[in-house]
C-alpha cells in the first residue's frame, strides 16, 4: 500500500513540474530546408550543399579543409581527390582554388594539382641526392618520375640551385643539371681526347664511342677552343655533321693549298673535299680574301689563267681567225667550267667585233665566218647556172628569203596527196591536169608543222581528204658536204668544231644561194613570151570553168538532204573544190608577182594573205572577199564572190548548159566507176558505191566526205530495192566493225598481258575481213554490173 502511495506522489510531482514548465517550439526538417533556401536566394546566407545533400558547408570551411588536406598530404594534392574528401561538387573546389592561390603565394596550381613550396623543397632535396649520386640528372627523367611539366620543374629547380641543390644547369641546354665534379671530370676527358687528335674527326663519332653527354661536350669544347687550351676549330656548329679540325692539320692543309694554287693557278673543289675541307667555296673565299678569283662549277681559277685566255681570244679576234681555249686550261677542268670561264672573258669584248662560240670552248671571229662563206661563193654561181640550164625553177620572193631563215625544215609532200588532187580534178572536169610540167623540180625541205588550213575535213574512210604539197625549198649543200669542204680549207680544227661550224653555215649559205639563184633565174626569165601567157590564161579559164560548173552541180545534189547534213556537205565542198578554184586564181595572180608555185594545192591561207598584201587595191577587195568566203557556210555567197573575183581578174567563166551538164555528170560517174573497179579498200568501196547509187537515183552529182556516208545510205532507203539497201547496210556495219577493231588495236600497243585479248580481237578482225571480201564484189555489182549499158542515161 505504501508503494502505491509513493507512486502517486511521484506522478503528482511530475504533473506539477509540467504545469509550471515553459513551452518549447520545434520546426520540421522540411520547414528548415525551405527557410535555408529562401535565405540563399535572398543572398543573406552563403552555404553549399554536400554531394549527399544531408549537410550544408560554407565556402570558408571548404577553403579551410582544402588547406588542411594539402598540409596532410605533404604539400601536393589533386583537386579531384579534394572533391572526394570534402564531398562537394568539383566546381566549388575550383572556385576556392583561385582564392587560395591569391591569398597564399607559396601555393601553385600545376596540371590540376595544388603544390606548395614545402613540397618543392623536399623534391629539390631528393633531386640533389640523385645528382650527387650520379653526377647529372635530366629534366626529362624528373618529369617522368614526378609527373610534372618540364618548364615548371626547370624553373623550380633553378631557383633552388646553390641553396638546396649543389650543382649547376647547362646554359645552352637547360634540360640537364650537373655537379661540379661531373663537369670537371668530363672536361678533363674532353681535353685529353681532343688534344690527341691530329686529323679532322667527326664529333658525333666521339660522343657515341666515349659516352659523352652531347650538350656538355659541345659547351666544354667551345670553352676550351675559345680559351686556347685546345688548338683547333669546330666546323659545322652543334650539329650531327660537326667536325673538329686540329690546328696542325689546318696548317698542313693551308700549306698544300697555297703551294698548289701558286704553281697551277687554280683550285679544284673536289681536291679540297678530299683534304677534309667540307665547304671548299667558303674556305677559299676566307683564305684568299684579297685575291681576285673566278669561281666556276667545280673549281676556281686565278687571274693569271683568265689573262692568258683573254690574250688568246683577243689575238684571234684581231687576226680574224679562231682559237680553242681547251688546250690552254688544265685538263681537270670540265667543258662546263671552260664554257663559264669563256663567257666571263667574252664580256670584255662585248663592244668589239662580234664573235661566235662553238663547242663551248672555240671562239671564232665574225671575219673568219665571213671568209668561210666567201669560200663557197664561186661554187654557188656554178651550181646556180647549172640549175638554170637543167631545170625550170620557182621564182623566189624577198618574203621567201626571210621565211627560209626561220623555217629550218619542211617535209616533202606525200605522193597520194597529188594523186588525190588529180582524182578530184578528174571527177570534176573529166580532164587530167598535172602541175608544173614534166621538168618541174621538187625542192625537198625537212618537216615543219603547217598552221594553215587546220580545219580541213579529215575523211580517212574515203581517202578523199583535201591536202596539198608542202612548199619546196632550194638547198645549196648538205651538212656533211659542207663539213668535207671546210676540212680542206681549215687545218688542225677539231671535228666537233667543224661539225658545228657547218651546221651554223647552212642557213646563211642557203639564203645566199637563194639570192644567187634568184638573180640568175631572174635574168633568164625576163624575156618570157606573150604567147605563153595567153596559153596560161586559156588553160586557167578552162579549169576554172570546169570547177565552177562542178560546184553548181554538187550544190544541186546537196539539197536532197536535211539541213545538218547540208551543212557538213557545204563545209566539205568549201574546203576542197572551192579552195581549189580559189588557189588557181591566186596562183595565177602570184605569177605576176613572182610568187607562183607548181601545185596550187600547196597554197595555204597564210600564203593567200601574203599574195593579197601584194595586190592592187581594186583586185585586193574582190580577192579578199573570195578568200574570206571559204570560211563561211554558204555556197551561194562563195559563187557570188567568185564571180566578182573572176571579173576583177579578167577571167572569163563559161557557164554550163544542159548538154554540158550531162557531159560532166557522165564524166564524173565514169571517173568514180573506174576508181571503184580497182580499189580493194572496203571503206572506199562503200563510199564510192553510195555516191554512185545516189547519182543513179537522183541524176545529181554529190561531193561528200566519208563521215556523211551513213546519211547517204539512209537517203537511198526509198530510192533503191530493199534487198540492195539491206546489202548496203550490212556492208556498212562490217566496215564500221573493221574500223573500230583497227582503232582498238592501234590504241592498245604491244603489251604482253593483252595476248589473249589480242588473239580474240584478231579472230574477230579476220572474220570481218573475210566477210568484207566476200561482199565487196556484190557491192560493186550494185553500180557496175547493172549499169554497164546505161551510158547515155543522162
Curated annotation (Swiss-Prot):
Transmembrane segments: none annotated. The modification Omega-N-methylarginine is found at residue 433. Keywords: Acetylation, Chromosome, Cytoplasm, DNA damage, DNA repair, Endoplasmic reticulum, Membrane, Methylation, Nucleus, Phosphoprotein, Transferase, Ubl conjugation, Ubl conjugation pathway. Changing residue 129 to A: Abolished interaction with CDK5RAP3. Changing residue 191 to A: Abolished interaction with CDK5RAP3. Changing residue 536 to E: Mimics phosphorylation; leading to decreased PDCD1/PD-1 ufmylation. Its EC number is 2.3.2.-. The modification N-acetylalanine is found at residue 2. InterPro entries: Ufl1, Ufl1-like_C, Ufl1_dom, Ufl1_N. It is an enzyme of class 2 (transferase). Pfam families: E3_UFM1_ligase, UFL1, UFL1_C. Catalytic component of the UFM1 ribosome E3 ligase (UREL) complex, composed of UFL1, DDRGK1 and CDK5RAP3. Interacts with E2-like enzyme UFC1. Interacts with RELA. Interacts with NBN; promoting recruitment to double-strand breaks following DNA damage. Interacts (when phosphorylated) with YWHAG/14-3-3-gamma; sequestering UFL1 and preventing its association with PDCD1/PD-1 substrate. (Microbial infection) Interacts with Epstein-Barr virus protein BILF1; this interaction mediates MAVS UFMylation and subsequent routing from mitochondria to lysosomes. This is E3 UFM1-protein ligase 1.
Amino acid at each position: 500500500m505504501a508503494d502505491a502511495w509513493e507512486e502517486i506522489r511521484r506522478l503528482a510531482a511530475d504533473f506539477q513540474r509540467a504545469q509550471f514548465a515553459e513551452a518549447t517550439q520545434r520546426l520540421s526538417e522540411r520547414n528548415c530546408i525551405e527557410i535555408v533556401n529562401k535565405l540563399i536566394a535572398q543572398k543573406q546566407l552563403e552555404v553549399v550543399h554536400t554531394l549527399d545533400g544531408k549537410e550544408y558547408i560554407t565556402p570558408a570551411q571548404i577553403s579551410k579543409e582544402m588547406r588542411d588536406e594539402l598540409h596532410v598530404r605533404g604539400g601536393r594534392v589533386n583537386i579531384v581527390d579534394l572533391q572526394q574528401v570534402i564531398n562537394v561538387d568539383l566546381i566549388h573546389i575550383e572556385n576556392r582554388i583561385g582564392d587560395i592561390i591569391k591569398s597564399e603565394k607559396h601555393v601553385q596550381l600545376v596540371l590540376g594539382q595544388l603544390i606548395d613550396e614545402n613540397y618543392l623543397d623536399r623534391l629539390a632535396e631528393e633531386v640533389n641526392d640523385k645528382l650527387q649520386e650520379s653526377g647529372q640528372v635530366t629534366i626529362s627523367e624528373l618529369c617522368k618520375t614526378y609527373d610534372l611539366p618540364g618548364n615548371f620543374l626547370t624553373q623550380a629547380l633553378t631557383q633552388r640551385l646553390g641553396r638546396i641543390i649543389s650543382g649547376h644547369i647547362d646554359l645552352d641546354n637547360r634540360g640537364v643539371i650537373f655537379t661540379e665534379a661531373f663537369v670537371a671530370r668530363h672536361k678533363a676527358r674532353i681535353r685529353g681526347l681532343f688534344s690527341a687528335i691530329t686529323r679532322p674527326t667527326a664529333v658525333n663519332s666521339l660522343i657515341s664511342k666515349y659516352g659523352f653527354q652531347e650538350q656538355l661536350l659541345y659547351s666544354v669544347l667551345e670553352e676550351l677552343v675559345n680559351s686556347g687550351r685546345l688548338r683547333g676549330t669546330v666546323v659545322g656548329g652543334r650539329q650531327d655533321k660537326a667536325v673538329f679540325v686540329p690546328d696542325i692539320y689546318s696548317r698542313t692543309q693551308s700549306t698544300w693549298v697555297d703551294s698548289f694554287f701558286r704553281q697551277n693557278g687554280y683550285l679544284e673543289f673536289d681536291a679540297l673535299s678530299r683534304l677534309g675541307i667540307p665547304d671548299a667555296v667558303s674556305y677559299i673565299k676566307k683564305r684568299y680574301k684579297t685575291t681576285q678569283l673566278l669561281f666556276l662549277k667545280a673549281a676556281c681559277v686565278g687571274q693569271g689563267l683568265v689573262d692568258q685566255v683573254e690574250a688568246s681570244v683577243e689575238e684571234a679576234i684581231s687576226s680574224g681567225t679562231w682559237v680553242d681555249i681547251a688546250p690552254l686550261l688544265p685538263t681537270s677542268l670540265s667543258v662546263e667550267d671552260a664554257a663559264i670561264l669563256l663567257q666571263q672573258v667574252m664580256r670584255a669584248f662585248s663592244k668589239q667585233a662580234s664573235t661566235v662560240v662553238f663547242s663551248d670552248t672555240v671562239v671564232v671571229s665574225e671575219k673568219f665566218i665571213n671568209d668561210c662563206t666567201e669560200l663557197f661563193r664561186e661554187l654557188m654561181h656554178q651550181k646556180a647556172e647549172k640549175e638554170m640550164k637543167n631545170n625550170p625553177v620557182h621564182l623566189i620572193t624577198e618574203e621567201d628569203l626571210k621565211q627560209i631563215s626561220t623555217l629550218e625544215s619542211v617535209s616533202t609532200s606525200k605522193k597520194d596527196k597529188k594523186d588525190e588532187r588529180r582524182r578530184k580534178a578528174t571527177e570534176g572536169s573529166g580532164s587530167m591536169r598535172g602541175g608544173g610540167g614534166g621538168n618541174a623540180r621538187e625542192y625537198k625541205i625537212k618537216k615543219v608543222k603547217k598552221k594553215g588550213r587546220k580545219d580541213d575535213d579529215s575523211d580517212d574512210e574515203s581517202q578523199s581528204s583535201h591536202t596539198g604539197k608542202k612548199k619546196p625549198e632550194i638547198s645549196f649543200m648538205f651538212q656533211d658536204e659542207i663539213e668535207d669542204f671546210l676540212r680542206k680549207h681549215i687545218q688542225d680544227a677539231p671535228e666537233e668544231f667543224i661539225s658545228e661550224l657547218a651546221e651554223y653555215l647552212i642557213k646563211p649559205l642557203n639564203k645566199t644561194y637563194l639570192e644567187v639563184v634568184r638573180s640568175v633565174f631572174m635574168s633568164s626569165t625576163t624575156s618570157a613570151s606573150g604567147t605563153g601567157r595567153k596559153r596560161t590564161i586559156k588553160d586557167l579559164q578552162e579549169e576554172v570553168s570546169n570547177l565552177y560548173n562542178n560546184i553548181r552541180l554538187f550544190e544541186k545534189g546537196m539539197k536532197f538532204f536535211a539541213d545538218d547534213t547540208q551543212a557538213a556537205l557545204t563545209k566539205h565542198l568549201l574546203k576542197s573544190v572551192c579552195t581549189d578554184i580559189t588557189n588557181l586564181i591566186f596562183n595565177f595572180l602570184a605569177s605576176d608577182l613572182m610568187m607562183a608555185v607548181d601545185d596550187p594545192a600547196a597554197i595555204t591561207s597564210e600564203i593567200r594573205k601574203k599574195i593579197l598584201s601584194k595586190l592592187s587595191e581594186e583586185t585586193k577587195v574582190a580577192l579578199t572577199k573570195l578568200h574570206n568566203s571559204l570560211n563561211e557556210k554558204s555556197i551561194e555567197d562563195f559563187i557570188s564572190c567568185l564571180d566578182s573575183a573572176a571579173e576583177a581578174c579578167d577571167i572569163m567563166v563559161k557557164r554550163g548548159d544542159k548538154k554540158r551538164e550531162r557531159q560532166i555528170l557522165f564524166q564524173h560517174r565514169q571517173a568514180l566507176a573506174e576508181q571503184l573497179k580497182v580499189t580493194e579498200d572496203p571503206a572506199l568501196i562503200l563510199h564510192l558505191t553510195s555516191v554512185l547509187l545516189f547519182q543513179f537515183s537522183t541524176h545529181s552529182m554529190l561531193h561528200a566526205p566519208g563521215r556523211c556516208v551513213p546519211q547517204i545510205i539512209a537517203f537511198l532507203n526509198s530510192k533503191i530495192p530493199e534487198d540492195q539497201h539491206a546489202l548496203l547496210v550490212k556492208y556498212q556495219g562490217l566496215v564500221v566493225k573493221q574500223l573500230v577493231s583497227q582503232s582498238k588495236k592501234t590504241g592498245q600497243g604491244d603489251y604482253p598481258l593483252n595476248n589473249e585479248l589480242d588473239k580474240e580481237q584478231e579472230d574477230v578482225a579476220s572474220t570481218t575481213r573475210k566477210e568484207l571480201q566476200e561482199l565487196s564484189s556484190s557491192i560493186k555489182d550494185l553500180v557496175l554490173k547493172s549499169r554497164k549499158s546505161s551510158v547515155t542515161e543522162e
